[in-house]
């Protein structure tokens, strides 16, 4: 085989690989949000009340959350699909264990970002007390896309240290948007 044939075969191989890479890249980008279509154009039920999370809090507002007087377990969600959501959870720590958030799309009851959400919002309760205490977590919601709002039920859960049985403590409905990958 002559040198010119070897060069031609080498250049042809590089061109074919480059074209294959471009097609693969196009396919990946086109299918990036595949599956998120079920979160587009969801009708928000009119018979339920929903809050839309405030996008952010000032440092002073965040500091003031510790002074809120609470008489029941409570969840407040702050943020958006772009930068993620902050979860402020109030709970009276009468038992050692783990406190965390679960989220469900409300009309189809689909659990959202199951592993990430429970892991990133998990707070270990080691000190017990008679007063409600503020716990904080942060996570993205991966399902959906920016500016396509859909109804979500956020639930506060507790799992005792010496048991695998989870207990749902409270829930709150919001309309949120997801994170574009």
Tell me what each language-model feature is:
Residues 91-95, 105-109, 156-162, 178:
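Beta-strand elements of well-folded, non-transmembrane domains
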Residues 37-56:
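Short extracytoplasmic/periplasmic juxtamembrane "stem" segments immediately C-terminal to an N-terminal membrane anchor
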Residues 95-137:
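Extended, solvent-exposed segments with strong compositional bias
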């Amino acid at each position: 085989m002559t040198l010119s044939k070897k060069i031609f075969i080498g250049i042809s191989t590089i061109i074919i690989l480059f074209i294959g890479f471009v097609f693969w890249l196009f396919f990946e980008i086109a299918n990036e949000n595949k599956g998120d279509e079920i979160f587009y154009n969801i009708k928000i039920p009119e018979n339920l009340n929903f809050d839309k999370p405030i996008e952010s809090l000032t440092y002073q507002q965040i500091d003031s959350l510790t002074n809120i007087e609470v008489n029941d377990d409570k969840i407040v969600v702050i943020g958006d699909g772009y930068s993620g959501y902050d979860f402020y959870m109030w709970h009276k720590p009468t038992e050692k264990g783990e406190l965390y958030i679960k989220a469900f799309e409300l009309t189809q009851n689909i659990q959202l970002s199951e592993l990430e959400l429970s892991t990133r919002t998990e707070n270990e309760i080691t000190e017990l007390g008679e007063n409600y205490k503020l716990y904080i977590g942060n996570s993205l919601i991966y399902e959906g896309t920016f500016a396509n709002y859909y109804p979500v039920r956020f639930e506060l859960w507790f799992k005792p240290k010496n048991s695998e049985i989870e207990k749902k403590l409270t829930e709150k409905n919001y309309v949120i948007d997801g994170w574009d990958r």
